[in-house]
A protein has these predicted regions:
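Basic- and hydrophobic-enriched, low-structure N-terminal and domain-boundary segments
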Residues: 1-162
Length: 162
């Protein structure tokens, strides 16, 4: 897959074993719960699930945005566009080689393949599968639609709810 961004680790918002953030282009369509992959040490891959997507500009405050719009004129046109990016926060859900240290600053972030999504969500480990539905990731040419299975022993039989 193509690179969609890079990991950001700052003094105020470091990467941890539980969370990481990355920047991406402001026109890239992502959704909460999409799965992303970060290249990590020992040629491993860390999987993250998107929790929050924010947009940030170089504006120091909301007041600066108001002033640059001719003091609140919604019809005013800006002479220059602000520099902006999308800032994405992810929850770490695993690593393919059991490497559990924070992902590093500047590492590339990718959309996950179908195989990587199954691995990240544990869908490749379901025993006694019975179809339960589908999960859809991404939009456009990157769209992935995957079947979701449940372990049939937990729906019916002695392990099931009574």
């Amino acid at each position: 897959m193509d690179t969609i961004g890079k990991v950001i680790a700052t003094e105020k918002q470091p990467s941890t074993i539980e969370n990481f953030t990355f920047w991406t282009k402001k026109d890239l369509k992502l959704k909460p719960f999409d799965v992303v992959v970060v290249e990590h040490i020992n040629n491993s891959k860390t999987f993250g699930v998107i929790e929050e997507i924010s947009h940030m500009t170089d504006s120091p405050s909301a007041l600066a945005g108001f002033i640059s719009s001719d003091f609140g004129d919604v019809e005013s046109k800006s002479y220059t566009d602000r520099i902006g990016m999308n800032y994405v926060r992810c929850k770490v859900v695993g690593n393919d080689k059991d490497v559990y240290i924070p992902v590093q600053e500047g590492k590339k972030v990718y959309l996950a393949t179908a195989v990587e999504i199954k691995m990240a969500l544990g869908l490749d480990q379901v025993k006694n599968p019975i179809p339960a539905g589908y999960i859809k990731m991404y939009e456009g040419t990157n769209e992935q639609i995957l079947p979701v299975n449940f372990n049939s022993h937990f729906l019916i039989g002695p392990e099931g709810a009574h």
